[in-house]
């Protein structure tokens, strides 16, 4: 479903942000 795709995208974005922040 669209909502599921949206949740997975937002979750992936959050993880990427965490990695960027942690790495920085």
Curated annotation (Swiss-Prot):
Chief place of localization: plastid
GO biological process, one term: photosynthesis
Function text: May function in mediating the binding of the antenna complexes to the PSI reaction center and core antenna.
Entry protein name: Photosystem I reaction center subunit N
Location within or outside the cell: Plastid, Chloroplast thylakoid membrane
Parts of the chain that traverse the membrane: none
Positions of region (Disordered): 1-24
Keyword flag Translocase: no
Stored InterPro entries: PSAN
Lineage: Eukaryota, Viridiplantae, Streptophyta, Embryophyta, Tracheophyta
GO CC, any one term: chloroplast thylakoid membrane
Record-stated family: Belongs to the psaN family.
């Amino acid at each position: 479903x669209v909502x599921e795709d949206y949740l997975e995208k937002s979750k992936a974005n959050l993880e990427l942000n965490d990695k960027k922040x942690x790495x920085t």
